[in-house]
Amino acid sequence: MPSQFFGLNIAYTGLLASNAAMNTTSNNIANVQTEGYSRQQVTQQASNALRVFQTYGCAGAGVETLAIERIRDEFYDGRFWDNNAQLGEYDMKQYYMQQLETYFDDDGKSTGFKTIFDQLMVTGMQALLKDPNSATAKSQFVGYAGALTEYFNGMAGNLEKVQKDINQEIKLKVDEINSIAGEVATLNKQINTIELTGVKANELRDRRTLLIDELSKIVDVQVKETPIIDANNENRETGANRYMVKIAGGQMLVDGSDYNGLECVARTSYE
């Protein structure tokens, strides 16, 4: 028969489990506005029962808290990253297409290619055809031709500026990708260090997922996490995981605590 203190111990385990649940709930409420925070839940199970060799069998031994885990769906994370990559791509295209639209704007009255071209080929040419010897018509035609030349030169300058802006944007994005990759690799090492002890590094995992969210705005990402098996026992997981991030059709960006930096290389040919 268990002692009277055994009942007190059962109550004590209940207090500990309830305290863990209350602390987790408080943490969830406190971080309701925290970007990237994942709601956490407490996993509990009944403690191993005590055999008391009585007719009723075993006596319950209370409750124990197994873990505090994030509530996160990897499937929806993957779908979000896929859609986020498309959103980032089209946002960037829209931004530069709107710039190009301003350069090609044509109101048909005073500005734009059609207006300038019509002045040359309709107004100027018709006047010259009517009176080929007219100095005024010739001068007017040359003036319209000069205006069209200036339009093309100005357009070329504007397009070159857009091209330089895009190249600079690419360089900045590459630097941002490298920065994120370095942070993810560092977090991978920190997470494994903690989780090797059997504790879930929930906050660090949230930070890592938030970085992948940012990365997915720039480039397509594929994330895979697999448990690391004990080298001496293939049936035992160590608690650590191999976290891999691939981009651009399967190129490895981050593999555990290592990452491969990207580099911008100028194109030498336009063929």
Locations of regions flagged by a protein language model:
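Phosphate-proximal small/polar/acidic motifs at interfaces that engage nucleotide phosphates
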Residues: 2-13, 19-82, 86, 92, ...
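Amphipathic, non-membrane alpha-helical segments that mediate helix-helix packing
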Residues: 4, 8-33, 82-104, 110-128, ...
